[in-house]
Amino acid sequence: MTVQVQDHDITTAADTAKLPQPMQPPLKQATYKTHTTDFIVNELLPLEFTGEGEHLWLHIQKSGMNTAYLAKLLSEWAEIPLRDVGFSGLKDRHALTTQWFSLRIPKKQLPDSEFAPVDISANESVTILEQQWHNKKLNRGTHRANQFIITLRDIEFASFEASLSLQISASEQPMSAKQAVEQHLTTISQSGVPNYFGPQRFGRSGNNIREALSLFARPVPESRPQPNKGKRKRVPREQNSMELSAARSLIFNEILAARVRDGSWNTGLAGEVFNLDGSGSIFASDEIDHTLRARLETGDIHPTAVLWGTSNEKVSGKAAAMETDIVAQSPLLMQLAVGLEQRDIKAQRRALRLPIEALSWEWEDKEDGQILVLNFTLTTGSFATSVLASLVQELITSSYSRS
């Protein structure tokens, strides 16, 4: 019998601010996204263009609109099908972002007018920074990383006791609140942070999880026979990708939270599946030996957890038992897991640890108080909010980005 999941349970589970951290965040409170330029995202896509071909690549800076909407505007301008517009990743609407788009334009017949959409609001802007011809379309997931420049305002430091916890020894002079923040930043630049999925994955108050439960309550669509072939074709999942991703992400976050609580998120367990840093390569190990410990300490490899689905055979031992136990103890997670399996979603692995590249920071004194500007790079598929959550106990989103 299926246990009824309470609406409050969904809201609570989707609240990423309540997820545990390995260290006490040194900032009690801060506000971000007060202005568009407080959250800057630059897509890092090293590429040598051929200078020829039928794909026009545009390097675009935008704000106030999401990536999918801009792709639609570009297709209308070029008078091409939306499927002929390519981009690598989705960028935040409430940010100043730069990313590449590709437009398949046969015979290089460009529109008569420059791209300058007129039906956009005062809060929306689009600027073409560069254009190149290339012989290939830009496919999803092509870029390797994103650079973030994030400004935190209205900063309130954590208690003096929390600052003391970051001292190296009791004999040292007590740290100032600002020094405690800088020590924390230095530490996470070396050790990384828990690789949680961010709140945007779950929608407002967890609505994407509610949509997933609604989807899983419906009959599973039957596969259709392919003409002249013995195989059966699965029903496309693109239309439900948001719900499926939210379900897998919530299960992953809960497993990672348990690993943070027991301290194994960056050390591994028996039967662990490891991810090779900077790649999609994984390998399993029955035990954690000296060599693996050394590689974990240097950040060469990372422990992983499951993105739930079928065929999850690689993990074993204590690591496997922990994953299944966490799901079994929660009616919400159980319903999500069963729904994913019934739709034949194949299990994948995701690193538990998120390395932070090129982390730097700068303090600025303003009339209304100090602000902290962070500059760092994260691999594709990770969330800047995971870095902010490790630093700030209560991160307040400005009313600008909630509009």
Curated annotation (Swiss-Prot):
Pfam families the record matches: TruD
Similarity section: Belongs to the pseudouridine synthase TruD family.
Protein name, per record: tRNA pseudouridine synthase D
GO molecular function: RNA binding; tRNA pseudouridine(13) synthase activity
Any one of the GO BP annotations: tRNA pseudouridine synthesis
Cleavable signal peptide: none
InterPro entries, sorted: PsdUridine_synth_cat_dom_sf (IPR020103), PsdUridine_synth_TruD (IPR001656), PsdUridine_synth_TruD_CS (IPR020119), PsdUridine_synth_TruD_insert (IPR011760), TruD_catalytic (IPR042214), TruD_insert_sf (IPR043165), TruD_pseudoU_synthase (IPR050170)
Enzyme class: isomerase
Record keywords: Isomerase, tRNA processing
Species annotation: Psychrobacter arcticus (strain DSM 17307 / VKM B-2377 / 273-4)
Residues the record marks as active site: D92 (nucleophile)
One GO cellular component term noted in the UniProt record for this chain: cytosol
Function: Responsible for synthesis of pseudouridine from uracil-13 in transfer RNAs.
Region described as Disordered: spans on this chain: 1-24, 217-240
CDD domains (UniProt xref): PseudoU_synth_EcTruD (cd02575)
Superkingdom of this protein's organism: Bacteria
Biased composition (Basic and acidic residues): 1-10
EC number: 5.4.99.27
Reaction catalysed by this enzyme: uridine(13) in tRNA = pseudouridine(13) in tRNA
Gene, per the UniProt record: truD
Domain annotation TRUD: ranges: 192-354
